[in-house]
Amino acid sequence: MQLTSFGCGPDAFMTGEVQTLLRNHGKNLTLLKIDDVNNTGSLKLRVRSLVESLRTKAEETKNCKSDTVSLPPYTEKHAGRKIIVPFFTPFISPLIPSLMKLAGYNVENLPMSDNASCDWGLKYSNNEICYPATLVVGDIMKAFKSGAYNPDTTCVAMVQTGGQCRASNYFSLIRKALMEG
């Protein structure tokens, strides 16, 4: 059971990760958004439903095995592969392929996000994450689903802020979408 007070930002990223971990072990996530309601009746109902489902499911999950899959890291053997990056801004994105070419990388910007990006992002990510994260996931999935990029010979690059920005959590969303897609 996860309690959340808002369901956006870090909560949304954590919810997606917890849900995946639990699903890999044959369990379900019960999410209680404590700011969603003034009446606690629905929260009590969810808790009672959780308790009942735990009773009936206890025997089923004893022999459950996890099928954890990971994406390979980019190494020297991948040199020369196409690397796609989401469109960041009209000021920075045009510079990325040229700068990365100087470092020996074959980088291509994805086009700016559109309505289809949003649709793909909603399909492959937690729909409570921030809108920019939905678009980034959608841009990447749209690119691969278009057939223009071979998943066996194309890599995805994404920035990591290492700080408090939610962009630090995009990697886990992208990874999950690629594995599910």
What are these model-predicted stretches?
Residues 2-181:
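An N-terminal assembly and electron-transfer interface module characteristic of large anaerobic redox
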